[in-house]
């Protein structure tokens, strides 16, 4: 079957070569099963690069062009969302409006209703189902990519809750679920009342093997060298960030690759904190959360470019669920990974298969190679039995008590947008989840858990249970705000109690509340990843006079210290030298804290703590730009960041009005501005007047 055999009315301009495009076997099977001709839900489980995404695209495009539909495409990570957005916009921008939304969880994002296809993260999908904007009812198709994330401890419950709520208030929506590794796909299909397409077919054959490296890393490096010499690219998975960078250095020391393109890439990724640019000149890079987004983007683009680009990337496990970076060979150097609270444990078989799925580039390789390293003959046999010949783990719902608490509150809040809710409707929601489908015999226990959770939520002020009718449950203002701000109940309580305590200390005791105290409040929340900083208590003691407050948030001191240095206008190299923290970690810390600061300012507003609200609102802007307070006016000029703002301030400009009145020649003299930017800068300052 060819693409031209399908009814592609309206898509001729997109698929101009349709007559020459032969559908892959899984694609043909899905088409024959009615994917494009019925309103059924579908679960499509097939290997990477077997054509799942194109099938989802065809479903969306047919709905848009033939039925005026609107579609959502949900993915697990921000980076993956942007990759899909760029890809879809390039391919379909001429016939459909493509949008993206990955943050701003409190907003119903009404602007999204103007788009035909919206790419969003699972978290954004979850937040929208809590807000239930009217435009969401007009969605005709929801594509859930990487649906096996339902089995992820952190993201799974939010995806599951979002899917259950969405199907409840929009029962006509079509759900297209995609996955490369989900052994119990029939179970998922039954939950979604979906047709199942399952296939093991790959466009490029895959060789899965155990690589014995009894003599150490030198044997692994020689194997990588061999592939590079033959013109191939290699992904090497290492179990830690430090390990991925260290192994990249080992490989770079043995490669003699060089090109003009690699030299240019080295310049792009050099921000003065480590030897990444030196590695890149040898055709090697590491890929982990140390990278700033700009560095990561440059590295990924180079690796995809084939030819004279990067040959080897040493990465951490998170890349397995990230952007598309196919390579001829994928090598897993370490299959045991450290998990907080569990120590070193073997990675799941599903993860290994997901990683191996990246091996073999269609149109480039005759076959792909997936290798997993063993250090002894006994270990080789164990790995072969467990990973090469073993069974995939079932995807199990991760609805723990904590996850259930958040999702029950989210459902109560979602119900409040319409007719309210009661115990029966909450139980109905729980009964519609994947968890309930997998645990039918446990529903009596689930009901008991629900009753206990409702009592706890009531005691903590998130909901009220009507005394005259204990079946009626309503979200309080605090509960509604917490859920809409996308806070865990624990974080919402931390913010409420912290804001009230700091406000009282300042008003009643005359305690000076520093910016660092406010940052530490934010860093106590679950959403912020703790960063390790040497001598953190000594540093913190110089930033706050409130010793009791410092000890209460000791585990979060590192993140607060890094954020404080950021708003103090410290540079990446300075922070790396002083704290040992990398640009990517700083960026992630600042990104999350910016949102948490906004959430805290909204919480302070709700609590009528006006001084705290004003302080937090200002702090939010400083976190966003990484500036001291004297630059707040200057960064309001479009296109002005922390470096140019400080240059303007040092040159005597205090605010947009002074910039607007300046001569172009004056602005040209400011470091970082120059002739090209000066005119634009003045124009933007005038707009601020």
Regions picked out by a protein language model, each given a short descriptive name:
Residues 2-45:
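Conserved pre-motif I regulatory segment
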Residues 104-140:
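Conserved helix/coil segment N-terminal to the catalytic DExD/H
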Residues 164, 183-250, 285, 289:
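Conserved interdomain linker/interface between the two RecA-like ATPase lobes of SF2 helicase motors
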Residues 133-169:
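SF2 helicase catalytic motif II
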Residues 62-83:
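Conserved SF1/SF2 helicase motif Ia
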Residues 329, 336, 348-384:
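Conserved segment of the helicase C-terminal RecA-like domain
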Residues 410, 451-460, 464-639:
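C-terminal helical accessory/scaffold domains
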């Amino acid at each position: 079957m060819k693409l031209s055999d399908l009814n592609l009315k309206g898509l001729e301009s997109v698929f101009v070569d349709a007559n020459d495009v032969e559908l892959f076997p899984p694609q043909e099977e899905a088409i024959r099963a009615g994917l494009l001709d019925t309103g059924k839900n579908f679960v499509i489980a097939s290997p990477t690069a077997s054509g799942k995404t194109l099938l989802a695209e065809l479903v969306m495009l047919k709905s848009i062009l033939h039925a005026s539909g609107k579609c959502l495409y949900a993915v697990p990570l921000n980076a993956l969302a942007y990759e899909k957005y760029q890809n879809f916009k390039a391919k379909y921008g001429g016939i459909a409006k493509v949008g993206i939304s990955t943050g701003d969880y409190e907003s119903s994002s009404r602007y999204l209703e103007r788009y035909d296809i919206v790419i969003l993260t699972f978290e954004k999908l979850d937040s929208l189902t809590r807000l239930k904007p009217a435009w969401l009812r007009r969605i005709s198709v929801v594509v859930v990519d990487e649906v096996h994330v339902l089995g992820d401890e952190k993201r799974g419950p939010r995806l599951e809750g979002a899917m259950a709520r969405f199907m409840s208030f929009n029962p006509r929506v079509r759900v297209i679920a995609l996955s490369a590794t989900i052994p119990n796909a029939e179970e998922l299909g039954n939950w979604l009342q979906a047709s199942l397409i399952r296939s093991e077919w790959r466009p490029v054959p895959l060789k899965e093997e155990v690589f014995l490296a009894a003599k150490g890393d030198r044997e692994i490096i020689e194997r990588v060298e061999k592939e590079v010499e033959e013109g191939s690219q290699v992904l090497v998975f290492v179990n830690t960030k430090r390990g991925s960078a260290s192994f990249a250095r080992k490989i770079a020391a043995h490669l003699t690759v060089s090109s003009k393109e690699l030299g240019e890439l080295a310049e792009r990724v050099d921000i003065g904190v480590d030897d990444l640019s030196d590695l890149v000149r040898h055709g090697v890079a590491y890929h982990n959360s140390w990278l700033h987004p700009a560095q990561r983007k440059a590295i990924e683009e180079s690796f995809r470019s084939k030819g004279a680009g990067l040959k080897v990337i040493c990465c951490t496990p998170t890349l397995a669920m990230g952007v598309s970076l196919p390579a001829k060979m994928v090598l897993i150097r370490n299959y045991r990974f450290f998990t907080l609270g569990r120590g070193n444990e073997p990675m799941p078989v599903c993860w290994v298969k997901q990683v191996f799925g990246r091996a073999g580039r269609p149109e480039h390789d005759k076959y792909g190679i997936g290798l997993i390293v063993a250090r002894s003959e006994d270990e080789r046999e164990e790995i072969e039995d467990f990973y090469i010949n073993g069974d995939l783990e079932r995807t199990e719902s991760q609805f723990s008590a904590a996850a259930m608490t958040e999702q029950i509150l989210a459902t109560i809040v979602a119900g409040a947008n319409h007719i309210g809710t009661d115990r029966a409707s909450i139980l109905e929601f729980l009964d519609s989840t994947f968890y309930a489908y997998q645990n039918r015999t446990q529903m009596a226990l689930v009901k008991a858990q629900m009753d206990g959770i409702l009592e706890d939520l009531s005691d903590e002020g998130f909901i009220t249970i009507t005394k005259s009718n204990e079946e009626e449950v309503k979200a309080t203002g605090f509960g509604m705000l917490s859920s809409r701000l996308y806070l865990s109940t624990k974080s919402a309580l931390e913010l409420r109690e912290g804001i009230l305590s700091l406000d009282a200390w300042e008003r009643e005791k005359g305690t000076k509340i520093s910016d660092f105290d406010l940052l530490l409040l934010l860093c106590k929340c679950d959403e912020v990843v703790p960063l390790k900083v040497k001598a953190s208590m000594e540093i913190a003691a110089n930033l706050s006079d409130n010793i009791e407050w410092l000890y209460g948030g000791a585990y979060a001191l590192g993140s607060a210290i890094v954020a404080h240095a950021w708003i103090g206008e410290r540079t990446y190299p300075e922070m790396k030298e002083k704290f040992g923290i990398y640009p990517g970690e700083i960026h992630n810390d600042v990104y999350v804290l910016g949102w948490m600061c906004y959430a805290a300012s909204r919480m302070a507003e709700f609590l009528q703590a006006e001084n705290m609200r004003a302080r937090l609102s200002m702090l939010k802007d400083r976190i966003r730009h990484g500036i001291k307070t004297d630059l707040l006016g200057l960064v309001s000029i479009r296109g002005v960041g922390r470096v140019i703002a400080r240059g303007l301030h040092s040159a005597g400009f205090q605010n947009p009005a002074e910039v607007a009145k300046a001569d172009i020649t004056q602005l040209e003299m400011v470091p970082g501005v120059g002739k090209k930017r000066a005119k634009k800068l003045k124009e933007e300052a005038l707009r601020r007047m």
